[in-house]
Amino acid sequence: MSLIPSIFGGRRSNVFDPFSLDVWDPFKDFHFPTSLSAENSAFVNTRVDWKETPEAHVFEADIPGLKKEEVKVQIEDDRVLQISGERNLEKEDKNDTWHRVERSSGNFMRRFRLPENAKVEQVKASMENGVLTVTVPKEEVKKPDVKAIEISG
């Protein structure tokens, strides 16, 4: 195990992937003590897995604690999948004394450029146990018609 994080992110990411719209952050794997509040940590770092099956592109995002009403899935500009959400702070009572605040609040947004074979009009999304699953069906690859030509002579 290396003590220095990979400069290009996790094992499944590819800096040269033309479909990724993430901005590369060289400091994302370093855990520096900062004055940033907890609201900037969990949502800014919302992780999304993208796998391609023979039938579809499947996106899975871990967003624990959010209700489906607090999450939006949209297709922008015909080929950009946008996943966003927001969790608000709890209402404070003047008589309450907080000893620790670790649950995060704030918003997040992740964007992915979909490939040409995506059927953007048939996108489906579901959420279960804090995991959002977005399924984008793929166009069937039409195999070219092959015609055998007889060789004379």
From Swiss-Prot:
Belongs to the small heat shock protein (HSP20) family. InterPro entries: A-crystallin/Hsp20_dom, HSP20-like_chaperone, Small_HSP. It is found in: Cytoplasm. The keyword RNA-binding does not apply. GO terms for cellular component: cytoplasm. GO terms for molecular function: unfolded protein binding. The keyword Nuclease does not apply. The lineage of its organism: Eukaryota, Viridiplantae, Streptophyta, Embryophyta, Tracheophyta. PANTHER family: HEAT-SHOCK PROTEIN 20 FAMILY MEMBER. It comes from Glycine max. Its main location: cytoplasm. This is 17.5 kDa class I heat shock protein. Pfam families: HSP20. Keywords: Cytoplasm, Stress response. Residues 39-153 form the sHSP domain. Forms oligomeric structures. GO terms for biological process: protein complex oligomerization; protein folding; response to heat; response to hydrogen peroxide; response to salt stress. PROSITE patterns: SHSP.
